[in-house]
Amino acid sequence: KYGPATGKTVDVLVIANCVALENRIFLEHVLYNNSSLLVQLGLDLDEMAARMAGTPPAGWPRDKRVWQNLRQAASPAGPLSVISPVVGFDLDRFVRANLDGLWNQADYALLDSAYADNFTFEGPTDRKFSGAADYRSLLESMRTAFPDLSLQVDEVYWMGNDVDGYLTSERWSATGTHAGDGLYGPASGREVQIWGITQHRVHNERITAEWMLFNELDLMMQIAAAR
């Protein structure tokens, strides 16, 4: 799949969002940082995306039914912050508003108001940094590539308390048109599907750490297929 063995050691971030009932997982979404894996193996991402799009795996690209099923929530039917609002710090509302503001509204002031000064970030394809500047650059490059990008939050889960802090997991999906040059090469006009999982560490109502993956290699394959 990835060519001859290289003997290289790789370090690949994996994020899983599991839903369990009575100590049994009945729904699991997993994202592997496959684009980072390819880079660590010394492979060219654009070449690999084009090759894989030319000989795609079974079930690719996703049809509308599969995509809509992916975007559905397991339970509850609506956000808890709407169904059962709380007094004080509402973590469900906080993380939903953060994702909507950053990705849909381009409200980059949230990087100062919702995040700690030196928050850490680990994301797709070896993106690791601290602080707001690099994160804003990533968001702006995505907005340039997909000017009409529209993200919806599919599910939110969390654990913790106001004293010790919280850990959150947000599963999300987005659609957009590759109408801008830049991050993924010249505009292709391709309508794309993006899905991701973002996890946060939250303390004193500020995000202190974020781990985020989305289907970047798959996204590059979608664009390559349109060329």
Q: Each predicted region: which residue ranges?
A:
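C-terminal and inter-domain tail/linker signature
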Residues: K1-R227
